[in-house]
Amino acid sequence: MITRFLIPLLALTLSGSLCAADSAPETRLKASVNQVVTIAKQAKDRTALITAVKPVLANILNFETMTRRAIGPGWRQFTPDQQREAVHLFTTLILRTYTAKFTPGESPSVEYKSCASPSPGRVEISTTSLYRGNRYDVVYRMEDQSGNWTVSDVVIEGVSLVANYRSQLDETFAQQGAAGVIKSLQRSVADSK
């Protein structure tokens, strides 16, 4: 399931679009995607790839918002230290899982199909990604954070990355609290090496 969310992040390259030419969110998404694709093609190994793409992804993906939403209402019961640790672990998990799916030299592609604004300060960019002969419908949910558009969720074939993690972490939080969520994320990170 996680592979379906991460392949499109790898698979993006520039293509045509139905969004306005001056669409700040789409322009920002495309620029970040181009950087990641270039870095990924040049990386010699997974460690180098993680190191190089982390600042680019941290600039476009809002890991704090994604982590908070993946944890859900229980987030408010986390201490500030637990919140920082959860964001760090979630970020590491996404980066490791993402880079594990990359094969150097491949040239995945994406078609930018449309932009929609479900509410002020929010945009959904619909795409179709083609990777290894498979086609994926991908929607990037972006939010305006004080003039800086960031991705707050990725929806693959109708399934939200944030909702997928939330379905896993809700039960853990209900049974074991914040400490249990941290331990679950630690295990997932350890398993992703």
Protein language model regions, located:
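Short beta-strand edge/turn micro-motifs at domain boundaries
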Residues: 135-163
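Surface-exposed, charged secondary-structure patches
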Residues: 95-136, 188-193
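N-terminal secretory signal peptides that target proteins for export/translocation
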Residues: 1-2
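Low-complexity, intrinsically disordered terminal/linker segments enriched in charged
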Residues: 153-193
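Surface-exposed, polar/charged faces of alpha-helical domains
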Residues: 38, 42-48, 77-81, 104-107, ...
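Sec-dependent N-terminal signal peptides
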Residues: 5-14
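N-terminal signal peptide c-region/cleavage motif recognized by signal peptidases
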Residues: 15-20
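Early exported N-terminus immediately downstream of N-terminal targeting peptides
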Residues: 22-98
